């Protein structure tokens, strides 16, 4: 049974790489019919739904994943990203804070937190998060682009 689940997850992942999200959902649903508590399927289905713009449904998948494993970094960071998309910046920041308590050097959580903090109007604090992320991963494009954008915002005032 595990090999079947593994094949289904691989197929879904490959479809996502090809941006065939609706088809990928069918594979995640098959996995979840067999094994409703499959953490990877719950998180990855959430990501796929988020890519399709189904943010509320994505959040439901992340919530289920976090019930299964409350300290799952992927679920926490993706939940924060989905909440950010809904402009729920404070809630998004809470997700990133939990992720950063678990892994204080998680550059993605730092950048995403910086983006949400920036949206609340605190650009100088956002810059600190972008710089911290770059101190961990100097090649992180999103951190570099976000830092430059934030500096441009401050310089234009």
Could you tell me what each predicted segment is?
Residues 17-18, 51-52, 85-86, 119, ...:
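Register position in tetratricopeptide repeats
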Residues 3-40, 47-51:
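Alpha-helical segment of the N-proximal tetratricopeptide repeat
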Residues 31, 64-65, 98-99, 132-133:
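Canonical positions in the second alpha-helix
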